[in-house]
């Protein structure tokens, strides 16, 4: 059975944990409203960080809704995610989006993270074989 909890071990909490993700990302995944940075983690499981700014989303209620949706999608796909640190940022306002549209965009990003990491891992294996 899959563990759907979201303990502190699965979160990026300190600025020092966010810094390498932003400065040296393994890759980035773009969508219309969101962007995710992925960094190869030393941890055994994927960890999530969020940088949802007041400048893009002025109300706390809206920011918290976005964070809740990101956390929920992360929890449901965590089992498939490789050991990466993933940080979500907001590219532009989500006022025009419904919660379902946000879920879909975030889910698409997480799917792309999984496929990009698999391709990168497969490429590493090919280079080691040569």
UniProtKB/Swiss-Prot annotation:
Keywords assigned: Endonuclease, Hydrolase, Nuclease, RNA-binding, tRNA processing
Domain of life: Bacteria
Record flagged with keyword Nuclease: yes
Gene Ontology molecular function: 3'-tRNA processing endoribonuclease activity; ribonuclease P activity; tRNA binding
Biological process, per Gene Ontology: tRNA 5'-leader removal
InterPro entries with a match to the protein in the record: Ribosomal_Su5_D2-typ_SF (IPR020568), Ribsml_uS5_D2-typ_fold_subgr (IPR014721), RNase_P (IPR000100), RNase_P_CS (IPR020539)
Pfam families assigned to the protein according to its UniProt record, in alphabetical order: Ribonuclease_P
A Gene Ontology cellular-component term: ribonuclease P complex
Family: Belongs to the RnpA family.
Subunit structure: Consists of a catalytic RNA component (M1 or rnpB) and a protein subunit.
NCBIfam families for the chain: rnpA (TIGR00188)
Function recorded in the entry: RNaseP catalyzes the removal of the 5'-leader sequence from pre-tRNA to produce the mature 5'-terminus. It can also cleave other RNA substrates such as 4.5S RNA. The protein component plays an auxiliary but essential role in vivo by binding to the 5'-leader sequence and broadening the substrate specificity of the ribozyme.
HAMAP family, per database record: RNase_P
Name of the protein: Ribonuclease P protein component
Source organism per UniProt: Psychrobacter sp. (strain PRwf-1)
Organismal lineage: Bacteria, Pseudomonadati, Pseudomonadota, Gammaproteobacteria, Moraxellales
């Amino acid at each position: 059975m899959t563990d759907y909890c979201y303990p502190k071990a699965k979160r990026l909490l300190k600025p020092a944990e966010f810094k390498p993700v932003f400065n040296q990302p393994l890759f980035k995944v773009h969508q219309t409203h969101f962007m995710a940075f992925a960094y190869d983690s030393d941890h055994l499981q994927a960890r999530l960080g969020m940088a949802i700014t007041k400048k893009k989303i002025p109300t706390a209620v809206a920011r918290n809704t976005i964070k809740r949706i990101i956390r929920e999608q992360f929890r449901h796909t965590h089992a498939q995610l490789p050991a990466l640190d993933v940080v979500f940022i907001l590219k532009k306002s989500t006022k025009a989006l419904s919660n379902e549209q946000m879920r879909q965009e975030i889910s698409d990003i997480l799917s792309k993270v999984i496929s990009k990491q698999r391709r990168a891992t497969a490429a590493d294996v090919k280079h080691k074989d040569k």
